[in-house]
Each structure stands twice: as C-alpha cells, then as structure tokens.
Amino acid sequence: MSISLTTKLSYGFGAFGKDFAIGIVYMYLMYYYTDVVGLSVGLVGTLFLVARIWDAINDPIMGWIVNATRSRWGKFKPWILIGTLTNSLVLFLLFSAHLFEGTAQVVFVCVTYILWGMTYTIMDIPFWSLVPTITLDKREREQLVPFPRFFASLAGFVTAGITLPFVSYVGGADRGFGFQMFTLVLIAFFIASTIVTLRNVHEVYSSDNGVTAGRPHLTLKTIVGLIYKNDQLSCLLGMALAYNIASNIINGFAIYYFTYVIGDADLFPYYLSYAGAANLLTLIVFPRLVKMLSRRILWAGASVMPVLSCAGLFAMALADIHNAALIVAAGIFLNIGTALFWVLQVIMVADTVDYGEFKLNIRCESIAYSVQTMVVKGGSAFAAFFIALVLGLIGYTPNVAQSAQTLQGMQFIMIVLPVLFFMMTLVLYFRYYRLNGDMLRKIQIHLLDKYRKTPPFVEQPDSPAISVVATSDVKA
C-alpha cells in the first residue's frame, strides 16, 4: 500500500517545526552570546567544542535507550513528544541568558546549552528513525523522504529571513527581549508540528512489534558491536563523515576565500543568493530524478557537483575573474549536490536498518540514526579542526593582505581538501556499498514476507506507558 499524502505532509510539517526551532540556534546563537549577552568568543567556542564531544557520547546512548523502549504508542512517538516539550522549554531558557550577570550567567549559559543539545537529541533521533518503520519499499521511501528534507530546508531559509527583523521590531533596543519572544513563536510551531506528526505518521514495520517482541533486549555493548557487523552501515557512516567534512569546510571557509583569494567579499552574497532556491528545487524534483536515474548516478552527482563548484571558484581565482554569474553557478552546483546527499543519506540509513535485520536478524532503527547524527556532528568538528590547523600552518593574519604562500594555503583549504573528501565518498560508494538493485529487492522481499507472517504487535492495555529496559552493560 502506498504512503498517503497526509502522511508525507505530516512528516514534512514535523520536520519544518523541528528545524524552525533549531535554525535560530545554528544561525544566531553565537551572535546572541557575543553581541547581546557579551560573552567572549573564546568562552563560547570552548563551550561549543565541549558540547560536540559530549554529543559523541550522548547520541549513541540515546539511540540505545530509544531502541529499548516499549510503549502502547510505539517506541519512537513517546520520545518525540518528550523531546519536543523539554527542548522547547530549554530553547526559551537558552535565549534568556541576558537576564543574568557574572558567574551566574556563565554557569547558566553552559548548563542550558548542554541541556539544549541533549533534549534536541531526544527528539531528533526517534523522528528520523520513523523512516524505515513507515515502509519497506525502496520506491516509497524515495517518495517520502524528500518531504521532510524539503520542509527542513525551507524552515532554515525562513529562519534566516525573519529572525533579525522580528527581533528588531519586537525588541527594539532590547535585542535580548526580541530573541526571547521569537523563541515563543518557534516553540508554538515546534509543538504544533510535532502533534500533527504524531497523529498522522504511524510505525508499521518497527522493531517494536510481534516479529521481535519475544527477543531479549540488547545491551549497549552488543549494540556497538552490531554497528561494526553491519558493514553497509559502517560504509555509509564513512561516506557521510567524508561528505560532511568536505561540505562544512566549504561553508565555514567560503567567506575567507572570497575576501582574500578572490579579493572581493561583496561577491560572497552572490554565492548564496540562488543556492537556497537550487536546494529546494532539487528536493522537489528528486522523486522524478530517482525514477529516471539510478541511485548510483545520483550519488555520483551528489559528489561531483560540489567538485565542479570548487573547480569553478579555483579557475576564477587563477584568472582573476570577478563574474557574478559564474559565482552564482558555483553556489548552485554546490547546493544541488548537497541536497542530493542529504535526501539520499536518510533513505540509505533506512536501507542499512533493513540490511541489518536481513543479515543479523536484529532491527535497530534508532541506533542507526543516532550514529548517523553523531557522524554529522563529527564532520562539523573535523572541518573546524582542519580549517584552524591549516590557517595556523600557512601564517594567516586577520584583516591584512595575505602573502602568496598564505593565499596558496587558502586555496588548499577551499579547493583541495574538500575535493579529496568528496572523491573519498565516491570511492567508498562504488567499491564497498552494495545496497542497490537486486540486493535491495532481495532484502525487501525477505522482510515483507517476514512481517506478513506475524500480525502487528499490540501492547496490553494494563502495560506501563513507557518501559525502558536497562542492563548492567550501560557503561560499555
């Protein structure tokens, strides 16, 4: 049975509210902390680094907790609701730091930021873990996933466009109050969209059903071992890490490249101007693309398009050409590639969940998506590390004309490093990734037959609302 439009739109609306709420943190929290609250850049940078390290530990543990959950509402929906409500509260507190001073302010900022990351993880992991439970059909997933990816991207563009005007209009000179009030708008959308998702999106092929209900719960140590035994998940994580490092290097370093190498920072907005539209358009036409082209071709496109973007920027720098149209084209190529990557990645993680059940007879949706989330955050951290390392090695000095050697080093950061990582994703995919064509069809047929033989699992009415099975292995 095909997925209804109501399900697709409800899942997409949930992604909109979720990313509407997170967008203000990714885009404006640094500005809020430094320019509104008055914290030092060093303190904020250290806090962000510590939070990413904690995420690397926290995300898989949260995935394990979700995987061990059994409830009358399924294994994911309770955590989506809990995560939404707690993250909404913490989001409001996050932008209330301007109300404190001195040591109390620093402590408040550190505690609320760490709590924000933890509560968002509670919601985000089970939200994306719904994908492999909605359908086992390859084509249906390819029709489903563009909806949440499109709405998530749209939320980011809306956040970028309306945040500062809202803050100025409502807060006036008191920007802290403006930010605080804007979080209430975000929270309203966040909670409303989550309710729509919970009402209309259903777990059909979850590991919390009659097929797996009688199996013993897995310890955290066993779960970590299963990640390595699922060779296709390991391969996908390697590809995702390489891709995220490359794209984060470009996103984080582009302003430096335009300022010093191309020599005109005013051209940077052209690089971004049509990129968002290209991203959204790619997500809209993805269902048609995947009918016309194989996933192998689309993955190649996801990796090659950003390489062409880098090559275009490199050629303009060498020829000393300042052409807005070429810069717009470079931004479009980059965003077409990244849009393809993000939608393919979500689908492919779902495929590795099916593969794990096919090969190991164990279905762990939340574990797969938790380690995928960890890899995305790791990619951001590694990218920042590479940028800082190379800038130090090449003798970069801010706000002055750079030497020829430094400019060459900047080209290495912006062009060579990303291209190497993008090429790595291609090599890993075509050499080691096998979940395509006949292999995927074989897995789908096997699992459909398996789930048809066992009716959906239903909790008894008198069972506990949420039961998380703990084990002595949690420290593993």
Swiss-Prot record:
InterPro entries: MFS_2 (IPR039672), MFS_trans_sf (IPR036259), Na/Gal_symport (IPR001927), Na/Gal_symport_CS (IPR018043). Residues 31-41, 98-104, 168-177, 256-266, 319-323, 395-408 are periplasmic. SUPFAM superfamilies: MFS general substrate transporter. Its main location: membrane. Keywords: Cell inner membrane, Cell membrane, Membrane, Sugar transport, Symport, Transmembrane, Transmembrane helix, Transport. It is a multi-pass membrane protein. The chain crosses the membrane at residues 8-30, 42-66, 77-97, 105-129, 144-167, 178-200, 233-255, 267-289, 297-318, 324-349, 367-394, 409-431. It is found in: Cell inner membrane. One of its GO terms (molecular function) is symporter activity. Changing residue 120 to C: Loss of transporter activity. Changing residue 121 to C: Alters cation selectivity. Inhibits H(+)- and Na(+)-coupled activity, with little effect on Li(+)-coupled melibiose transport. It holds the Pfam family MFS_2. GO terms for biological process: carbohydrate transport; sodium ion transport; transmembrane transport. Residues 1-7, 67-76, 130-143, 201-232, 290-296, 350-366, 432-476 are cytoplasmic. The keyword Cell membrane applies. Changing residue 52 to C: Retains weak activity with Na(+), Li(+) or H(+). Belongs to the sodium:galactoside symporter (TC 2.A.2) family. Mediates the transport of melibiose and other galactosides by a symport mechanism. Can use sodium, lithium and protons as coupling cations, with a preference for sodium and lithium. The use of Na(+) as coupling ion for sugar transport is based not on ion selectivity but on competitive binding under physiological conditions, because of a much higher Na(+) concentration under physiological conditions. PANTHER family: MAJOR FACILITATOR SUPERFAMILY DOMAIN-CONTAINING PROTEIN (PTHR11328), MELIBIOSE PERMEASE (PTHR11328:SF36). This is Melibiose permease.
